[in-house]
Amino acid sequence: MRVILAPMQGVLDPFVRQLLTQVNQYDLCVSEFVRVVDQLLPTKVFYRLCPELYQQGLTASGTPVRVQLLGQHPQWLAENAQRAIELGSHGIDLNCGCPSKTVNGSNGGASLLKQPELIYHATKALRAAVPKALPVSVKVRLGWDNSEQAFEIADAVQQGGATEITIHGRTKMDGYRADRINWAKINDVRQRLSIPVIANGEIWDWQSGQACLAETGCQDLMIGRGALNIPNLSQVVKFNQAKMPWAEVLILLHQYAHTENQFDTGFYHVARIKQWLGYLKKAYPQADALFQLIKTCHDGQALRMKIDGVMN
């Protein structure tokens, strides 16, 4: 079984990837999306969103990273895919699942679910641009507002030549509502395809991971929000290990707090720590207490002083 760390825009930035891969055995990470419009992007854009490209596309602990592209113009997706591959990406992933209103408003992400033919052409262009030895993957949801087109969407991906497909078990309109997860539909789609299907959605622990594998019939899982709730989730899902003790979570947060300038992700660092604590408190009651302690911090120095105090 492979366990893949999902792309989460504005959340799983390069340094969080580094932290999580150093305490897990992820088989692959997918980067935050590189937005492609109507031009070949400069190399600095790829390096900013995926600095692992400086290290042969690997995190510090050796986990391969695959660049994800977002856009709706097959030609420009293909040209930017070639650039990402030249820089060292371990294949290319196409984003057809992001539910963000901003992204969808510019005809990217999940908006492509309404246009299976465009998904086909984009996938085909990527497959032609990427060397055959390297994978082209596509991440989708079950549909826009219902799952009636799920088969058509998946067929478009397969007919376009993708190596594998990741299916999030909800529609775009379902958002992240737990009661809307539909693993059974992933299984229906999987049985129709000959390419590998990676299941995604509502995987929080060993039990839900096993349930997802059983109901979808998939052999591989992609985890996103759960990886932030329990920082060693791949170990939990793969090996039924216990969740990481809070003391070890604190060490990760301490590392994060002291690397404010290591990567330029374009996001406000203090807010990112607070955001991560929002995820952590679902599994660790201590995270809420720490959030209350730092919630008035507005700069990195104040944040570090607070966290250093807790560590000591």
UniProtKB/Swiss-Prot annotation:
The EC number(s) this enzyme carries: 1.3.1.-
Domain of life: Bacteria
Keywords, in A-Z order: Flavoprotein, FMN, NADP, Oxidoreductase, RNA-binding, tRNA processing, tRNA-binding
Needed cofactors: FMN
Active site: 98 (proton donor)
Primary role: Catalyzes the synthesis of 5,6-dihydrouridine (D), a modified base found in the D-loop of most tRNAs, via the reduction of the C5-C6 double bond in target uridines. Specifically modifies U16 in tRNAs.
Protein name: tRNA-dihydrouridine(16) synthase
Species of provenance: Pasteurella multocida (strain Pm70)
